[in-house]
Amino acid sequence: MPKYRKKPVVIEAVQYLGKQNYQDICKFVGKELTMEYMDTEQILTIETLEGELKANKGDYIIKGVQGEFYPCKPDIFEKTYEPAE
């Protein structure tokens, strides 16, 4: 079976920390986002190429290579990405 490696692409991302950086996330994506409250969680709704996805506190919001935005769980983000200069 052929194997493939991800191309080294530098991305922009911001970790969603909840209400405290909601405005920073909105500036990053360039528009106001809907924030829902589920119990004590503050969940963001993000328009992606595949439709609406939810971002929970702790998730990273990533700007993709086509300028699209999508959420990524922190454990996946940390396995996939490392800081770039």
Q: PLM features: what roles do these ranges have?
A:
Residues E50-E85:
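Short, compact, well-ordered microdomains
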Residues M1-T40, T45-L49:
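N-terminal non-globular leader segments, chiefly Sec-dependent signal peptides
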